[in-house]
Amino acid sequence: MATTGALGNYYVDSFLLGADAADELSVGRYAPGTLGQPPRQAATLAEHPDFSPCSFQSKATVFGASWNPVHAAGANAVPAAVYHHHHHHPYVHPQAPVAAAAPDGRYMRSWLEPTPGALSFAGLPSSRPYGIKPEPLSARRGDCPTLDTHTLSLTDYACGSPPVDREKQPSEGAFSENNAENESGGDKPPIDPNNPAANWLHARSTRKKRCPYTKHQTLELEKEFLFNMYLTRDRRYEVARLLNLTERQVKIWFQNRRMKMKKINKDRAKDE
């Protein structure tokens, strides 16, 4: 309201007395400080009260002497243009401490080795699960500690296989030893070849082991074949009982002997 009243008086004086006289009156009547506008000062930056002060050490200026050092001042003494300049800094938000300044002026690499029990920040990848005591990676690959708890560490995977696989290996070895003992100790029951449910991978051969005849048995069978190439059922039973053979064995031997004799006679006819 004071500014509009002063402008109104200025226009009234210029209309009545003229422009030159109005300028002289306005200079004497209205001092520079009465309009409520503070004089423009040098461009000094002040920190915004909502942001925490920067904790990094001051380094050499990059842009020359045009950048003035930052002074702590109240929010009422900063012009609107300076506030507008502050809003163009997108990285002024509070951040996690990345590096801590050492007393000798160097930055310590605190992000490489996080302390045990530290909290992980959301959205930031972590190289080691926090809350676990870091173990040295210089352990030999064969010296793997047993897994007493469910917590996992990097050294568990440096031994060649995950802990779950190492737990399964002893049980599998014991199972294979038991199978070997069972196979060597007792004979398995014979598998029925007519059973379609039997697995052909584990089924044994159904062919019986070849049982060669003794010299005595062969000689007696040859004598009987010379007398009669075909045996009756009663005579086959008697021969099998005398030679300690089954009737089927006697029958098969006579069939094979007849086929052999037929082949010999055929070859002899070709030679003649």
Swiss-Prot record:
Subunit structure comment from the entry: Transiently interacts with PRMT5 in TNF-alpha stimulated endothelial cells. Interacts with EIF4E.
Protein name: Homeobox protein Hox-A9
Associated clinical condition: A chromosomal aberration involving HOXA9 is found in a form of acute myeloid leukemia. Translocation t(7;11)(p15;p15) with NUP98. The chimera includes NUP98 intrinsic disordered regions which contribute to aberrant liquid-liquid phase separation puncta of the chimera in the nucleus. This phase-separation enhances the chimera genomic targeting and induces organization of aberrant three-dimensional chromatin structures leading to tumourous transformation.
Sample GO molecular function, one term: DNA-binding transcription factor activity, RNA polymerase II-specific
DNA-binding region: 206-265
Superkingdom: Eukaryota
Subcellular location, record wording: Nucleus; Cytoplasm
SMART domains the UniProt entry points to: HOX
Family designation: Belongs to the Abd-B homeobox family.
Site, Breakpoint for translocation to form MSI2/HOXA9 fusion protein: residue positions: P163, V164
InterPro entries the record matches: Abd-B_homeobox_TF, HD, HD_metazoa, Homeobox_CS, Homeodomain-like_sf, Hox9_activation_N, HXA9/HXB9/HXC9
BP GO terms, sorted: anterior/posterior pattern specification; definitive hemopoiesis; DNA-templated transcription; embryonic forelimb morphogenesis; embryonic skeletal system morphogenesis; endothelial cell activation; male gonad development; mammary gland development
Family annotation (CDD domains): homeodomain (cd00086)
Posttranslational mods: Methylated on Arg-140 by PRMT5; methylation is critical for E-selectin induction.
PROSITE patterns xrefs: HOMEOBOX_1, HOMEOBOX_2
